[in-house]
Structure formats: C-alpha cells, structure tokens
Amino acid sequence: MTLLAIDIGNTRLKWALYPSAVPGSEPVAHGARFLETIDQLGEAEWAGLAPPPRHVLGCCVASDSVRHRVEEQLELWDVAPRWVVPGAAEAGVTNGYDHPMRLGSDRWVALIGARARVLAAGARRPVLVVMAGTAVTVDALDADGRFLGGLILPGHGIMLRALEAGTAGLRVPTGEVREFPTNTSDALTSGGNFAIAGAIERMHRHLQQRCGEPPLCIVTGGAGWKVVPALTIDHELIDTLIFDGLLTIAAQRG
C-alpha cells in the first residue's frame, strides 16, 4: 500500500512517498516546494513517482485555495486524498483542546507522531512538542497521551518584521545570537531567539511540575535548527515528526 504523505504549512509543502503505512519506515522519495510553485508538482517531481501512490494522507494549515491547488496536482493518479481533521482522540492521543476540531491539524499530527515515537522507544513519559516555523507552537502531552494544551507565538521572522514595522530605525541586517549583544542586529536576533527558547523552557517546567517527571522535548519544523542552540534543556531535533504522525494515523485507519 504505497502512501503519499503531504504536509502543507504556511510557507512550504513537504511530501514523502512510503512503500507502506508502517510507522518508522523510510520514504522511497521525498521533496519540498514553496507554496508559490506547487502548481508544477504534477509535471515535475510527482510525474515520475514509482510506484505510484495508492493512498494519499495529508495535513494542511494553509488556505482552502492552496489545498485545492494541491488536489489538482493529485489528479495525476486515480486516488482521493484524505486530509487530517483533529478529533476527540486518535492513535493513542486524547485531545484536550476546548474545541478539538479547532486545533491545528499540524499540531495534532505532530502530537500523534511524538506519542508514537515515545511508545516505540518503550517509554511512557510526558512530551513537549515544539514546532518552529512561520509561527512557533509548544504543546504538552502527558504520559498517558493526553494533550494538556499549548502555546502559539510568532516565529523569529514575524517578530523582526513586527519590530521593523512598528519602530523607527530598526531595519538592520540579520545579526548573530550573543549572550550580551552589543549592536542592534545582534540584539534583535538574540532577543527573538531567547524569547522563543524562554517560552519553550517555561512550558517544560510547567509540564514537569504537572506530571512529576522531566518531559522529553522534541523540536521539529523548518526553523527548528535556529531554536535548539539556545535551549538549556535536553531535546531532540526531529525533522520528520509530521510524517511520523501521518504514518501512524494511516496505519491505525488501515
């Protein structure tokens, strides 16, 4: 059962073709495109996929129009895509959001992927799931797979653009992360980086206090590599967490 897994974010589309819906399996092909160029997928990367996908499962946080553009590219094969919609529970994770369907599908899928990884490692422990991209989410999962809640904060780029738009004289080149910045470029870059790291570490403390044991911290997303150098807590950087979740969901649904 070949599976095409699709992750449509705010900026990019990422995809991976798997020989079967088995969690932990390796893709036979994968790629990524900025949303501006997704109309070329059917004539480019996807045109030569072999074997062709028998099933398509994806999550999308972009607009309906973007999703429809992707569906047009999927007409290359006679297969109807399924899009993940968060619910009350799935694949061992219970949704604690006040309105479960309003949780972002990417957050939901990442939580399921994180839970699957923890169980595959033979552990039952709380997990803090960080997705760093255009926005940053920091979500708490207890040892029983209950999603307790989480944070949404602006990503580093949004922070800098907001400061540039609202403050005179701050249109400066990107700086470096320094403990004690001595110029405006470094001050802006360090400030954004430390703000995100601080939110992550505070939620880590909250989750440890709630569960009575140190949680595992998993960082994913296109900007994850920018975040982890500032963290003082133990963490893992896992680029494939969304795909881990999609594989787990596909395996559960059959």
From Swiss-Prot:
Lineage top rank: taxon: Bacteria
Cellular component terms per the entry's GO annotation: cytoplasm
Pathways per UniProt: Cofactor biosynthesis; coenzyme A biosynthesis; CoA from (R)-pantothenate: step 1/5
Major site of localization recorded for this protein: cytoplasm
UniProt xrefs under Pfam families: Pan_kinase (PF03309)
Catalysed transformations (reactions): (R)-pantothenate + ATP = (R)-4'-phosphopantothenate + ADP + H(+)
UniProt cofactor note: A monovalent cation. Ammonium or potassium.
A GO BP annotation: coenzyme A biosynthetic process
Residues that, per the record, bind substrate: 97, 104-107, 184
Keywords from the named record: ATP-binding, Coenzyme A biosynthesis, Cytoplasm, Kinase, Nucleotide-binding, Potassium, Transferase
Residues that coordinate or bind ATP: 7-14, 134
EC number assigned by the record: 2.7.1.33
Similarity remark: Belongs to the type III pantothenate kinase family.
Subunit structure, as described in the record: Homodimer.
Protein name per Swiss-Prot or TrEMBL: Type III pantothenate kinase
Phylogenetic placement of the source organism: Bacteria, Pseudomonadati, Pseudomonadota, Betaproteobacteria, Burkholderiales
Gene that this polypeptide is encoded by: coaX
